[in-house]
């Protein structure tokens, strides 16, 4: 298994849930040096399609206790995520997505222009703004985490469980 986020998580859950530890992480570089250390750090489950939303929502639930589970601070911060709508069409699309999310039990809040202005007062709300703001879709539980910290947390745990790491 490779030493990126997916590989490390796979090795961890194989060891934790199924007691399978005769697994080797083979990483051509270094743990946390690939995409897992360079991505956007955004955590969300704000997807339109049922299967996608529910899949990512399951991941959101894992993030909530991951620092405690790994005994490693992954710097999870559920500060919310706001997707700005820059046209009436985009606002309607976000309303549709938000409705789909709520039907699946996923948190979603539509914000009008004034609601966005209260939350992001420094944004350009002028008539001449390059990207005018019509409103937004907010997922209050969305947030960020340090994905490279997640890689190191998984690596430390699987090493202690007997999984071999070769880098």
Regions found by a protein language model. Give the residues of each.
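Beta1/beta-strand and adjacent pyrophosphate-binding region of the FAD-binding site
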Residues: 1-6, 24
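Gly/Ala-rich phosphate-binding loop of Rossmann-like dinucleotide-binding domains
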Residues: 11, 15-16, 157
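Glycine-rich FAD pyrophosphate-binding loop
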Residues: 15-39
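Short loop/edge segments at beta-strand edges and connector loops
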Residues: 27, 112-113, 167
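FAD-binding beta-loop-beta segment adjacent to the flavin cofactor pocket
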Residues: 32, 120-129
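Dinucleotide-binding Rossmann-like beta1-alpha1 core, especially the glycine-rich loop
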Residues: 40-122
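Helical element adjacent to the flavin cofactor pocket in flavoenzyme catalytic cores
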Residues: 137-167
